[in-house]
UniProtKB/Swiss-Prot annotation:
Catalyzes the reversible conversion of 2-phosphoglycerate (2-PG) into phosphoenolpyruvate (PEP). It is essential for the degradation of carbohydrates via glycolysis. Pathway: Carbohydrate degradation; glycolysis; pyruvate from D-glyceraldehyde 3-phosphate: step 4/5. This is Enolase. It is found in: Cytoplasm; Secreted; Cell surface. The gene is eno. It comes from Mycobacterium leprae (strain TN).
Amino acid sequence: MPVIEQVGAREILDSRGNPTVEVEVVLIDGTFARAAVPSGASTGEYEAVELRDGDGRYGGKGVKRAVDAVLDEIGPVVIGLNANDQRLIDQELLDLDGTPDKSRLGGNAILGVSLAVAKAAADSAELPLFRYIGGSNAHILPVPMMNILNGGAHADTAVDVQEFMVAPIGAPSFVEALRWGAEVYHALKSVLKKKGLSTGLGDEGGFAPEVAGTTAALDLVTLAIEAAGFKPGADVALALDAAATEFYTDGIGYHFEGMTHTADQMTEFYADLLGSYPLVSIEDPLSEDDWDGWAALTASIGEQVQIVGDDIFATNPERLEEGIGRGVANALLVKVNQIGTLTETLEAVALAHHSGYRTMISHRSGETEDTMIADLVVALGSGQIKTGAPARSERVAKYNQLLRIEEELGDAARYAGDLAFLRYVVETR
C-alpha cells in the first residue's frame, strides 16, 4: 500500500519572478514526487485564496506562511494515509482548512499537496500520470490554444483583450499542430518587424506590440497564419480571451477601446468579429458577475462560437452548476489552482462534460516547469489546452510533455483537431 511517509515544502520562484509553493511527497515504498503551484495575473474574485506573507520580502508576495502550513499542519494529517485515496486526502485537506475559499491554509498550500500526492501515487503504480488519472481509455491529444499576441494584464500595452490565440485545428497530429503553431508564431514576429512594431514578449511568451485595438491585432495574427503558409480557419483558427472583468467597472460598464459599453454592446462587438474572422472560441467576454449579460450573450452567439467561462466559474462546481442552469457559456476553463484540489477539479470537469459543456485545461500567467496539466488534459479527454506561446521554457515544458505522451500512446493517440470545435469551425476568413 503506497502510504505517505514524508511531506516537504519550499518557496520557489515562478516565471514572473514571484514566489510560489513547491511540495514534495515521499511514500513508504520510496516513491518520490514533486508539484509546483502556478499563480495568475488576472485572478477572479471567486478563486481559492493564495496565502501570501504580506511582509517586506518579495514585495509582500512571499509564501513562507503557505510553506509552514504544509510542514506544520497539512503534513502531519496526511502522513500515514494511502496515496491512492485521492478523494479522502483532498477531503482531509478541505476539512483541515475549514473555510469556503481555502483562505486559512491557502489554496497554494493545499493544491501543492493534492497534486504531489497524485503524482506519487501514479509513480508508485508505475503508471504515467495521464493514465493514472484518466484510465486505460485516455488517448486524446489536445488542440494547443497558443497565446501568440498578448494584451490586457499580460502586457504593458493599451490593448484591452488579454489573449489572441491560434488553434491549429487542421493538423493531423499533435506533433504537427505544435509545428504549425510555432511556425505561425515566428511568422508573426516577422510581420511585426516589417511593420515596425515591437517584438517584446508578454507574460505568456506571446508578442506584446502596441496596436490600435482588437481588430488590428486579429489582422496581424491572420497575416501571420497566411505568411506561414496556412489557411485561416481551415488550418489554423483564431481564439480570444477578453478577460473582461479587467476592464469592467460596476455600475458604469465596460471601458473598452476608449469607450464605455453595455453588455449588449459588447455582444454586438463580438458578433461583428465572428462575421470577419475565423474565431472558434471567446473566453470571458463579459465580467465575472454579469450573469444576465452572459446569458444574453450565450443565447445570441453561443451557436456560432465556443463561449468559455473562466472567472465567472472559477473551476468551481457550484458556480458552474448555477451557470448551466442560467444558460451561461458553453465551455469551462479549467485551472487547478482556482479551486485548489485535484478532486474538485475532476468534479468540475465531470459536471461540465455531463452537461454538454466543453472544457479547456489552462495554465496561469505565473507558471513553473511543472507539466501536470499536460497529463491532465489527456486524462480528461478535454481536447483543448491553453498554455501560452511556443516559447519560454515554462510554457514549452507542457507542449514537450504532450509530445512525449503522444509518442507513448503510439497508434492509439488521436489528435482532437477540429472535432474539439466542430460546430464552430469556419473554413474561410
